[in-house]
UniProtKB/Swiss-Prot annotation:
Gene3D superfamilies: 3.40.50.12230. PANTHER family: METHIONYL-TRNA FORMYLTRANSFERASE, METHIONYL-TRNA FORMYLTRANSFERASE, MITOCHONDRIAL. It comes from Thermotoga neapolitana (strain ATCC 49049 / DSM 4359 / NBRC 107923 / NS-E). NCBIfam families: fmt (TIGR00460). Belongs to the Fmt family. The gene is fmt. The lineage of its organism: Bacteria, Thermotogati, Thermotogota, Thermotogae, Thermotogales. Its EC number is 2.1.2.9. This is Methionyl-tRNA formyltransferase. (6S)-5,6,7,8-tetrahydrofolate binds at residues 109-112. It catalyses: L-methionyl-tRNA(fMet) + (6R)-10-formyltetrahydrofolate = N-formyl-L-methionyl-tRNA(fMet) + (6S)-5,6,7,8-tetrahydrofolate + H(+). Keywords: Protein biosynthesis, Transferase.
Length: 313
């Protein structure tokens, strides 16, 4: 079966690498253009492009996959199916109708829940107990197509974004191979999503990263782990923006929201609107991530200081 892979970040690159390892016939790759990244704003290739070049796969980087040159490339490689993972751009009807078997997206949520760009982060932020991966046939409406394959996993209470994403990548690898085998054997039976149950996971904005310590300890814990380790949950300390990582525990004791109540080797107990949360790491502006214990010993932080979650654009 002739497969074109469409994707951009590391999530997609890991899946592509595995597909090549398993001998899937990848006849072409589509990814986003190179973009400036990091403090130096150096132009870097996408992780998917890196894998494509490493494996000698034909790869294009159109501004839009719906443009003439991209459509010509797709026609030239004559795919049976397009596999899409975290591409970040909309596929138009000409692309969707081009492959013999259609276009299928690998989406890290239990659709119809968490349609959109940030399903892993939003599931963690909302304190979901389970999530999963859905492979569905793409239609014009975002993440609304009929489901071909779906698998569920439990979310651990203190699992971070990095940890959960890694597990969902591994699940996606297994599922895409299973899906392609079933597709080739005519064993795919699509089922429509229940659109009345749809929820959404919009693109993350900077204001979403700030911790509101007036909320309860569970809510604060979930906010921190949803953005751990990237891009990091935010707060203000003495007027400076800091990042928080490693939400480890919650306690029913009460204290002033945002107040750093107690610091030990395991972290800092911080007050919230209901209970306290224990957080292990804090990153000061322009510095590396350190434990609260290290910061206290370095006289950079002390008990009685207050973290605030206000955000002004």
């Amino acid at each position: 079966m002739r497969v074109v892979f469409v994707g951009t970040p590391e999530f997609a690159a890991e899946i592509l690498r595995y597909m090549v390892k398993k001998g899937i016939n990848i006849v072409g790759v589509v990814t986003q253009p190179d973009k400036p990244k990091g403090r130096g704003r150096k132009t870097l290739p996408t992780p998917v492009k890196v894998v494509a070049e490493e494996k000698g796969l034909p790869c294009i980087q159109p501004e839009s996959i719906n443009r003439k040159e991209a459509l010509e490339f797709l026609h030239s490689v004559n795919p049976d199916v397009l596999i899409v993972a975290s591409y970040g751009k909309i596929l138009g009807e000409k692309v969707l109708s081009l492959p013999k078997h259609g276009c299928y997206n690998i989406h890290p949520s239990l659709l119809p829940k968490y349609r959109g760009a940030s399903p892993i982060q939003r599931a963690l932020e909302n304190g979901e107990k389970k999530t999963g991966v859905t492979i569905y046939r793409m239609v014009k409406e975002l993440d609304a197509g009929p489901i071909a394959l779906q698998r569920e996993v439990n979310i651990d209470p203190f699992e971070t974004f990095d940890q959960l994403e890694k597990r969902l990548i591994e699940l996606s690898k297994e599922m895409v191979i299973e899906f392609l085998e079933k597709l080739e054997n005519g064993e795919i039976h699509l089922r429509e999503q229940d659109h009345t149950r749809a929820t959404y996971a919009p693109l993350i904005k900077k204001e979403d990263l700030f911790v509101d310590f007036s909320k309860g300890a569970e809510t604060v814990k979930n906010k921190i782990r949803a953005y751990d380790s990237r891009p990091g949950a935010r707060a203000f300390l003495n007027g400076k923006e800091v990042k928080l990582f490693g939400a480890m525990a919650v306690d029913s004791s009460n204290d002033e929201p945002g107040l750093i109540h107690y610091i030990d080797r395991e972290g800092a107990w911080i007050g919230t609107g209901k209970g306290m949360v224990k957080v292990k790491y804090l990153q000061l502006p322009g510095k590396k991530k350190l434990t609260f214990w290290e910061l206290r010993n370095g006289r950079l932080i002390e008990e009685g200081m207050k973290l605030e979650g206000r955000y002004e654009s």
